[in-house]
């Protein structure tokens, strides 16, 4: 089984979807802790898109010299079989922002 790490950017096939859920094959950020990633067949992800507006639950960052957005308001858990490729790790500054937005949005 492939090992996936928290804050790793991966390509995920999100189809099939319903309604306003983000769809198709796209980059996603793994946000579940490594302990969960190691022991379960699922990971929790935030989809990434290059087409978004500024919004409090969306964080911009550069990926392949293109501005992309981590869509924290569409966080969800997926089976690892949906992952098709590992791209790399999110930068430290963006990780700090992701943690803060997740805490602000879901913990308080």
Features from the language model and the residues they span:
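Conserved functional hotspots at enzyme active or ligand-binding sites that engage polyanionic ligands
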Residues: 1-108
